[in-house]
Regions:
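A short helix->loop->beta-strand "cap" motif at the edges of active sites that frequently abuts
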Residues: 56, 113-114, 194
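Phosphate/diphosphate ligand-binding glycine-rich loop within oxidoreductases
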Residues: 1-79
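Short amphipathic alpha-helical segments
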Residues: 49-52, 103-106, 180-183
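Glycine-rich phosphate/diphosphate-binding loop of Rossmann-like nucleotide-binding domains
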Residues: 1, 80-171
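Short gly/ser/thr-rich secondary-structure transition/capping motifs
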Residues: 20, 75, 147-155, 189-191
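Glycine-rich, N-terminal phosphate-binding loop of Rossmann-like dinucleotide-binding domains
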Residues: 41, 171-172
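Glycine/threonine-rich flexible loop motifs
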Residues: 172-193
Length: 194
């Protein structure tokens, strides 16, 4: 907005989608009004499904599995406060399994030389989703023949990690994303707290 931009906020309840217009037609209409779109949707495939149908940029403002705009702000804050992201030791703590921001932040952090410490309570089984664990392994294997250093650790005791990290990234329990009758809810009072 400081650069002269203007925002057009379109709520799905206020759009012509309610009258039967296709989402693709809505995007085509928006394309005529603006230079870019930030889309927040519970559909995690919406950008990949439609990005080739319009000639303006689309930014993921949050979907079912990721929240890259929040992760960009978090990355910006780390850099703003510490002057760099490279060579930092970063603890990522809490409900790792259900957090959308963690997935996006980890993917961004893997572009830097960082050591990541994933801290979660073992009995809660809230560690990283399997696909993110596989992604970490894949990226680490690709970096073996480069100067890109990727280091990550799993830890159950935050007290062990606090003295050695530069950043502690805390997430809350994502109880709205838990399945009903999930054992994790039984442990909500035992989640890691600072």
């Amino acid at each position: 907005l400081h650069l002269g931009g203007k925002v057009i906020n379109v709520n799905s309840q206020e759009s012509s989608v309610q009258k039967g217009e296709t989402f693709n037609d809505t995007l085509k209409t928006m394309e005529a009004y603006c230079d870019g779109l930030i889309i927040r949707s519970p559909n995690n495939e919406i950008l990949s499904d439609y990005q080739n149908n319009i000639d303006i940029k689309m930014i993921n403002g949050g979907d079912k599995f990721e929240h890259p705009t929040q992760a960009l702000l978090d990355l910006f804050t780390i850099r703003q406060e510490l002057g760099t992201v490279n060579n930092l030791k970063i603890a990522i703590v809490g409900d790792l399994y259900h957090s959308r921001t963690i997935i996006s932040l980890v993917k961004m952090l893997l572009n830097y030389n960082v050591a990541l410490y994933f801290v979660f309570e073992e009995e809660n089984k809230m560690d990283l989703p399997i696909y993110l664990q596989k992604y970490l392994i894949e990226i680490k294997e690709k970096s073996y023949n480069t100067n890109h250093i990727i280091e990550y650790h799993y830890e159950y005791d935050l007290d062990k990690v606090i003295p050695i990290v530069d950043v502690i990234y805390m997430t809350r329990s994502q109880k709205e994303r838990h399945m009903p009758n999930n054992d994790n809810l039984l442990h909500k009072n035992k989640l890691i707290r600072l």
